[in-house]
């Protein structure tokens, strides 16, 4: 028994605390960079279709889905080998997508067609196409899977979609050029970032009414350069980290008061981000500088820059 405990202890010590990978889409190189979260080095680069942007994994992490925007396809890759298994029908110019909690349906924003396409990933067939506003991009799904959100950049709206009927039941105005959306607090709130508006709007999911709005101000940075795009919540949902685009900073927001507590300097044109497995570090994609900044979450400071491909865009964690 003692020997067994010793072996288990030695095995636990051998496993890195941050073991896992961050997968990054490089939209100008048509590649994916895979970063080891223990060594903080790129360990693999895989070829994709043209202009990869959105990226997400299946629930069991056996498949990775990639929005190959200029190939007009969502590609399905085997993450163990980097092999493209097949393409899914996606509509034209897929930007972002969200995987339904059933792990079977992808909801895809089609920028050129002003629709949201619903694809069954098993049958590889389009289930529905839902008319939304002009230039849809951001996608979110409620934790219970009953509501999907599409944001439209030109119409400046968040569109609320009933997943049971694939119909719109509400449209809410936001500031100029909404880019990203996320549900929080068990689905009670919806947050939407507006790139040109320089804000994040918070909605009550039950009523679609506005609960609050946050703006950002960085000393020495012109307001026109402060452009919120992607954001991520800490597991306890006390804080949100917000990528501010060409402002080259990430804002730390108190998710209870909607107040900005701090700004962290990162690479140039920070776009999206992903936490590692224990949420101790945050990895940001910086398009213009072609790198990923590693943020120590507890210390709220950047600790390393990792060079990847040209114009990194999306990021996703794989254990």
How would you describe each model-predicted region?
Residues 6-7, 17:
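Cleavable N-terminal signal peptides
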Residues 1-5:
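Positively charged n-region of N-terminal signal peptides that target proteins for export
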Residues 12, 16-319:
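Predominantly soluble domains enriched in secretory-pathway, periplasmic, or organellar proteins
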